[in-house]
């Protein structure tokens, strides 16, 4: 059996599509029981100092972009969905046709707002949850 080098693994991962990479990360999380979320928030959200009350509600760090209406120019919306998700034409068209549909899941606020802006510029209506 030949040895696979770290460089070969990195090259293989670098050639994956966004969708393939997302699925790969989820499989790794499940297999090893870990999370790919940044650990810095956990350290910052450590137990409050004596006398301080814990915040009533934690600030949301992961957002979903939900397409609610494709608008009049479905072709432009499909192109944006493909660019954002890395999906093929058939899969992107299915997301645009089957509303509401999740376009991006568990992304940062900035990434969610950027995706929403791109979708709205193409004529779609979407929301961030």
From Swiss-Prot:
GO terms, molecular function: mRNA binding; structural constituent of ribosome
Gene Ontology CC, one term: cytosolic large ribosomal subunit
Alphabetical GO biological process terms: translation
The entry's keywords: Ribonucleoprotein, Ribosomal protein
Signal peptide (UniProt feature, chain positions): none
Pfam families xref list: Ribosomal_L12 (PF00542), Ribosomal_L12_N (PF16320)
Matches recorded under HAMAP family: Ribosomal_bL12 (MF_00368)
PANTHER family: 39S RIBOSOMAL PROTEIN L12, LARGE RIBOSOMAL SUBUNIT PROTEIN BL12M
Function according to Swiss-Prot or TrEMBL: Forms part of the ribosomal stalk which helps the ribosome interact with GTP-bound translation factors. Is thus essential for accurate translation.
Family as reported in the entry's similarity comment: Belongs to the bacterial ribosomal protein bL12 family.
Subunit organization: Homodimer. Part of the ribosomal stalk of the 50S ribosomal subunit. Forms a multimeric L10(L12)X complex, where L10 forms an elongated spine to which 2 to 4 L12 dimers bind in a sequential fashion. Binds GTP-bound translation factors.
UniProt-recorded name of the protein: Large ribosomal subunit protein bL12
Encoding gene per record: rplL
């Amino acid at each position: 059996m030949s040895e696979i080098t770290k460089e070969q693994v990195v090259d293989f991962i670098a050639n994956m599509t966004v969708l393939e990479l997302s699925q790969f990360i989820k499989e790794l999380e499940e297999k090893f029981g870990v999370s790919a979320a940044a650990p810095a928030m956990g350290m910052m959200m450590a137990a409050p100092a004596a006398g301080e009350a814990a915040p009533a509600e934690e600030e949301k760090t992961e957002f979903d972009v939900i397409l609610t209406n494709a608008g009049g120019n479905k072709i432009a919306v499909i192109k944006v969905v493909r660019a954002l998700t890395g999906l093929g034409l058939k899969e992107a068209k299915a997301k645009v046709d089957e509303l509401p549909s999740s376009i991006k899941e568990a992304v940062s606020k900035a990434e969610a707002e950027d995706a929403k802006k791109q979708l709205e510029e193409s004529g779609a209506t979407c929301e961030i949850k």
